[in-house]
Regions:
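Flavin-dependent oxidoreductase catalytic cores
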Residues: 1-192
Length: 192
């Protein structure tokens, strides 16, 4: 948190001229009601850059997605991977992996809002984990992917480890659970 602001992304752009850069996760309410000039600051040199959104209300996520697309972001990414206590308390982040129907509803609303914006081709993507806590049922992961893909998500950014919602800090969640090797070739084409 508090790292990938516009200054950090400008530096990353120098290091990686073609990489897709991501913002910090910003809650949909903050996009709608907050100080956009501060929260969504972006220099043209940063492109391509994806806005990472947090939330679980399809209507709020739709409004935030439309605003973000029209502000020039190259991708809108729904974060379903953050394990922090604060994020869980707000019912967004990794805990949403337990609610694939809600995530699908959110993605459908986001895609519809972006599709009717001034920039209808901006993709809506999802960041997720392989599972939550000790749920390591790969079929459950595939069910999540299928459900959300059917709602229109064509790209998933998979953090290849489970998110532990109790007992580990977000930093530990990036280090402690073992990484799982998967190959991604397209919708529902995942293998161990």
């Amino acid at each position: 948190m508090d790292w990938t602001d516009t200054h950090c992304r400008a530096f990353h752009r120098v290091l990686a001229p073609s990489a897709l850069l991501y913002t910090e996760m910003v809650h949909a309410n903050a996009v709608i009601h907050g100080d956009r000039s501060k929260l969504l600051a972006m220099d043209p040199s940063e492109h391509p850059v994806a806005l990472q959104l947090g939330g679980s209300d399809p209507n709020l996520l739709a409004q935030a997605s439309r605003i973000s697309a029209e502000l020039g972001f190259d991708e809108i990414n729904l974060n379903c991977g953050c394990p922090s206590d604060r994020v869980q308390a707000g019912r967004f982040g990794a805990c949403l992996m337990r609610e694939p129907a809600l995530v699908a509803e959110c993605v459908a609303a986001m895609k519809q809002a972006v599709g009717s914006s001034a920039r209808p081709d901006v993709p809506v993507t999802v960041k997720c984990r392989l599972g939550v806590d000790d749920d390591d049922d790969f079929e459950q992961f595939l069910g999540f992917i299928d459900s959300v893909a059917e709602a229109g998500c064509g790209t998933f950014v998979v953090h290849a480890r489970n998110a532990w919602l109790k007992g580990l800090s977000p930093k530990e969640n990036r280090e402690v659970p073992p990484l799982t090797r998967i190959a991604s070739c397209g919708r529902s084409d995942f293998s161990r």
